[in-house]
């Protein structure tokens, strides 16, 4: 090994310590910058733009092709993480630092995200003509397809309007309009015609054409955001639609929603009681929950451990959503879609672990109520969870096959300091999960494969390093992460590469290396 390689290993081994808010010793980096940023996705929602850029730059300079492919995975609303702000911020860096790389992937931006993800490129001297030519070409295709009664893209829905209340939006609209050689009147007319052909629900709402809305065709997010407006302005038709939905006679779109989006809508703040309470049973929310894509597929080898500690009550960025909302939503989602002994079961942990049984919950509302009742709002003692699993195995003389193959920890990663029963066996620098692994080994068991799902870390502490203990490190809010959770891959970096090197992201690589 060369001197620099040895130095890198020395840094990772002896100069890589980080500490959580509650004193647990972990690491600053996994050893791979791409793995670091992937594990930090949820935390970056609350980060400043420069912090996002600094995190991405390290991965970009480590391996540009992999970093850009990962960025499209991060943005991917259907098969990835669905992170819009992170994608736009990192792409802005690429556009400024290496515009030729950004130019190559512009044709794929709308495929993985939305057309308006590229409007900020209009501020870039190199990329502006590339974006404008792309818009021109796509619009011509859409007009031809419309005239031939074929499906068209959603470009018209996202094109900026010249009469927008936002000055910035109007600037972008006029840049595009002038490139197309249109007057303001012609531009508005074209967008109106294409949006009418697309059957955009917001256009009908603005025109108060409630009776013309086809509820079975309303997109996922619109179903969630406008549910109250539909009931208020078109209650009879909306109720008729929801009744058919319960009977399985129609469908509802929910493919790009996050579980916590739905769970959070069930919450309301009760000022008289000074705390949150649950709203009444909601047919639309229940239907949207059932329509979420099933990424678990009855896998029965995984037990979820959901953090219910006090730090999980911190809100995520500028939303009312808390890390606890996310953890409860993912725990319910995973538990009810599992099979075998772990179906409708998960563990919650703070100062003491509890087994949560969702069997009595008939509706999503019921299950949220059960989950909330088990939120202890104390400190975060993850070690106690593994002690519970181990003692259960020992007391019942279980084999290795009887205990969970995977333990999925959904948390803000601010764990308590490791506590050893025999202090002589672990030094003050003992890492929390090394301590736990030793306990299992002494009892004749292998530690279950660990999956850490970060939903809001604030110290940036990584619980384990690359190739340690056979773990997966994931982050974000999308159920699409479940494929990585249930993967048998023991190396966290390879687990991530399996995802971003899949066929789904091959078009990105093809354009980059062309």
Give the positions of each predicted feature.
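Long lumenal/extracellular ectodomains of secretory and single-pass membrane proteins
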Residues: 1-326, 336-514
């Amino acid at each position: 090994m060369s001197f620099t390689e040895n130095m890198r290993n020395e840094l990772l081994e002896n100069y890589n310590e980080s500490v959580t808010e509650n004193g647990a010793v972990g690491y600053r980096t996994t050893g791979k910058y791409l793995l670091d940023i992937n594990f930090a996705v949820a935390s970056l929602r609350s980060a400043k733009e420069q912090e996002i850029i600094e995190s991405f730059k390290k991965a970009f300079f480590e391996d540009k092709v992999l970093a850009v492919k990962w960025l499209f995975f991060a943005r991917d609303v259907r098969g990835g993480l669905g992170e819009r702000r992170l994608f736009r911020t990192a792409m802005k860096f690429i556009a400024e630092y290496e515009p030729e790389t950004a130019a190559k992937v512009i044709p794929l931006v709308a495929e993985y995200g939305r057309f308006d993800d590229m409007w900020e490129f209009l501020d870039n001297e190199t990329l502006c003509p590339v974006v404008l030519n792309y818009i021109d070409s796509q619009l011509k295709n859409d007009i031809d397809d419309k005239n031939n009664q074929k499906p068209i893209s959603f470009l018209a829905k996202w094109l900026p309007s010249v009469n927008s209340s936002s000055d910035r939006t109007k600037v972008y609209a006029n840049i595009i309009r002038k490139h197309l050689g249109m007057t303001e009147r012609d531009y508005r007319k074209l967008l109106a015609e294409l949006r009418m052909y697309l059957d955009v629900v917001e256009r009908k709402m603005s025109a108060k054409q409630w009776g013309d809305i086809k509820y079975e065709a309303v997109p996922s997010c619109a179903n969630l955001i406008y549910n109250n407006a539909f009931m208020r302005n078109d209650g009879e038709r909306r109720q008729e639609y929801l009744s058919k939905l319960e009977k399985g006679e129609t469908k509802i779109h929910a493919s790009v929603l996050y579980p916590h989006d739905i769970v959070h809508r069930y919450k309301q703040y009760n000022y008289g009681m000074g705390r949150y309470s649950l709203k009444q049973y909601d047919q639309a929310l229940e239907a949207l929950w059932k329509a979420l894509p099933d990424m678990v597929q009855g896998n029965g080898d995984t037990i979820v451990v959901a953090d219910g500690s006090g730090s999980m009550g911190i809100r995520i960025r500028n939303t009312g959503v808390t890390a606890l909302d996310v953890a409860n939503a993912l725990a319910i989602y995973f538990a009810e879609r599992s099979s075998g002994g772990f179906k409708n079961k998960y563990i919650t942990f703070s100062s003491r672990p509890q087994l949560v049984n969702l069997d009595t919950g008939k509706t999503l509302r019921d299950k949220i109520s059960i989950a909330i009742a088990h939120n202890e709002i104390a400190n975060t003692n993850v070690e106690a969870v593994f002690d519970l699993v181990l003692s259960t195995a020992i007391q019942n003389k279980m084999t290795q096959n009887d205990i969970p193959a995977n333990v999925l920890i959904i948390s803000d990663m601010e764990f308590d300091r490791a506590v050893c029963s025999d202090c002589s066996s672990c030094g003050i620098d003992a890492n929390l999960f090394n301590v736990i692994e030793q306990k299992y080994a002494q009892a004749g068991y292998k530690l279950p494969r660990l999956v850490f799902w970060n939903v809001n870390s604030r110290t940036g502490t990584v619980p384990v390093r690359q190739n340690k203990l056979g773990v997966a490190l994931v982050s974000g809010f999308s159920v699409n992460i479940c494929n990585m959770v249930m993967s048998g891959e023991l190396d966290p970096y390879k687990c991530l590469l399996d995802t971003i090197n899949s066929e789904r992201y091959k078009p990105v690589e093809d354009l980059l290396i062309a």
